[in-house]
Amino acid sequence: MVGPENSEKPTILIRGWLWFRDIPSKPLAKLRGVARQAIELAKDDPRRLIHSLKVGLTVTLVSLLYYLQPLYNNLGASAMWAVMTVVVVFEFSVGGTIGKCLNRGLATLAAAALALGANHLAILSGGENEPYVIGLFVFIQAVAMSFVRFFPKVKARYDYGMLIFILTFSLVSISGLRINEVIKLAQARFVTIVIGASTCLAVCILIYPVWAGEDLHKYVGKNISQLGNFLEEHMDQCFKRSSDARIEITKPSISNLNSILVDSKGREETLANLAGWEPGHGQFMFRHPWKQYLKIGNLTRQCACRLEPINDYLNSNIQAPQEIQCKIQEAFSESGKTLKELAWAIETMTKPSSANPHIENLKTASENLKILLRSGIKGDESDILQIIPIAVVMTDMVSSVEQIGDAVNELSLMAKFKSKTGNGVEGESEIGHDKNCIEIGMAEIPSLSVAIDERTEFSADEQILI
Amino acid sequence: MVGPENSEKPTILIRGWLWFRDIPSKPLAKLRGVARQAIELAKDDPRRLIHSLKVGLTVTLVSLLYYLQPLYNNLGASAMWAVMTVVVVFEFSVGGTIGKCLNRGLATLAAAALALGANHLAILSGGENEPYVIGLFVFIQAVAMSFVRFFPKVKARYDYGMLIFILTFSLVSISGLRINEVIKLAQARFVTIVIGASTCLAVCILIYPVWAGEDLHKYVGKNISQLGNFLEEHMDQCFKRSSDARIEITKPSISNLNSILVDSKGREETLANLAGWEPGHGQFMFRHPWKQYLKIGNLTRQCACRLEPINDYLNSNIQAPQEIQCKIQEAFSESGKTLKELAWAIETMTKPSSANPHIENLKTASENLKILLRSGIKGDESDILQIIPIAVVMTDMVSSVEQIGDAVNELSLMAKFKSKTGNGVEGESEIGHDKNCIEIGMAEIPSLSVAIDERTEFSADEQILI
């Protein structure tokens, strides 16, 4: 029993020493981690750094009220309200800042006026009852305004205003009990608040402004284009892999799909709310149809949702007849192209006319696949059973893509997108690709040619793609 | 030309009169609409009304500082900070209120201490440079803290604290330039803030407290149970309709599915963040595994997402072989039962052991369906093609339900759910129903009995359900 004890002691000592030695390095490692995260945040969106500098600048500017004797003599201790306003009101986007300024300004004015009225009423009611009457007023308005904050519309846009209303009403009405010069004080405060708010607005709008509307516009476009990329590249890889070699599938695009599904809803709604406060800027008018972006966003999410089950099938080695694979691949790649055209139309604010032929192709491809499956079902059954889930996802997706197309068309009418000058180069190479694909299919299975014969009523433009 | 003009004039007059007459009724109608909405909000969750009354009570209580002479003499104009604290800090849930109180309190203390230190440094640097040094400090801290607010973790839990830090640091350090009794002033403010915050906390916790953790717990359970109901009832209706008469499908459950998909994510994350601030209460310990609820919520959303395409098939009249319909119906109803058992386990905080047999049944049903489809595919092809999309959705869903089961099991281990005292009555009637269903199938198609023979290795419990 002596041996183990002896050898244990030094181990404990060594462990203790190691633990002790690591103490300074642990917080250092953490600090390094934080620094790395900070650099990533700044690289990811440099506007964050600019925003921080803008806040610093504005706070320092407003502090001048304290440093400069003549200004301070006029405003006194109320000057602190200017600093307060800046810190509380300065938001990342112009819309956020304007919204908070308006909320704060209007709520302060309205609440102060009402509170002075309430004070007057209380004085009229007689000296003794004054505190009770004012207490009653304060109670009633606090209850009412707290309840109004639960209204969904108020919560989305005027929550801050309601808070300031309760605050100002309470402060002004109870101050009236003690300070007789309440109006003079309120004046000084109001002036400082206006100074703070206007400095804020000036810095926010004039120096590298961040427009929530522009962010929303880009974000919705980016999501559609990500979905399009996913469809084009990812599905391509998926089919290549089953026919060619085992190519490593790039996982990032799947996680992109997930981020569209999960995070976009809240972000889009916030941005649309903020964008509503913004004046016209750049290509956007004052009443740009921001709500329509939410509709497009919802449809994009729906489409991503319908694509989600596809992940499960990607890992299985698909062994379906070549011509069915071809049709499915065609539909996916057409969807991808449609979505990318739509995203491009949103981005450049041009009419999405170039997406229309893709949508037509898509409908044709989807119909063709259905016909093919019905006629081809006499083939190897287990293979067809394997491919059917993907075909189902595809059919769902096609209707989703069509809906997105309609919604973008509506947007282009509402926001008066400009017409595009034609470019037809991109399309040609794709047609060649699809034709190849069909020729392989035609050679292999006769039922396909029957399916094609059934569709002779289609226009020449569509027939190329059948 | 005289005739129409004559008849037009009175029309304009009448229209004008009608428009004029409607003026008072329009705002009245709007007011009535708002009142109706308010009543609905209060009925929907009476805690909203109680919260509003609590806010009113607390604001009025704190206003007493102004009414009572001895209190006012001690605190002076700083008493307004108490009102301010109450209005800004009082949140709907206990977690929100505690979080804001801690954020406000700690940030104020830290910022005030640092600002006093900065002031001291500035004084040491010599009288002339003082404003510049302080201006530099204010600038640096405002930039740094504004940037720190972009860190996702900080944004989720400490955003308000960061705001208060910037505010307090700026106010205290620039006040130091003017007011020599800055420490005395800070003391009075701190006391009033503590008074405001403690009144807030007392009212919030002692009178009808709203626990964010409890809300999260119930909400996650409710979503799972809604999904279970949707599966059981809705799918039942769907198949009844195709075989029996055209029964009206109740749409509300589809919209429930949508609300799970769209709104739950943000709400769950907010509640989990708030729940993190709450002390132990009722059945929940201080460190209840709130994060696990987020995981369960994510899986529930995934399951709802996979079910979403089913809506498109509900409107088509399904005409598949009876025994396949039976299998699918069985799988959906088993999933429904599993989910409802899991929801019940969460709700009552008991171990979800009663869900396990359902999960086993579910796996069996899913396997059986696959076998059946493979063997039964020689039947009427167009019918099978019609049923396959639903079968695909079902397979996806089964794996989702299994994952939810695993996650709930994990939760029950982490949160030490109590074991359940057995109840076996519910299950029996279901077995009878399923048996019926199988007997119909058995009579019609021989391939099913082969499928069943293949599975003789299952336990007796499972065989009843095959």
Q: Where do the language-model regions lie?
A:
Chain A
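Extracellular/lumenal glycan-associated surfaces
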Residues: 91-92, 306-308, 400-402
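Aromatic- and histidine-enriched alpha-helix N-cap/loop-to-helix transition segments
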Residues: 56, 298, 302, 389-392, ...
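Alpha-helical transmembrane segments and their membrane-interface boundaries
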Residues: 1-189, 205-215, 449-466
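Intracellular, membrane-proximal regulatory regions of polytopic membrane proteins
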Residues: 1-36, 42, 180-191, 202-387
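Long amphipathic all-alpha helical oligomerization modules
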Residues: 350-398, 412-466
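Membrane-helix cytosolic exit motif
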Residues: 207, 403-413
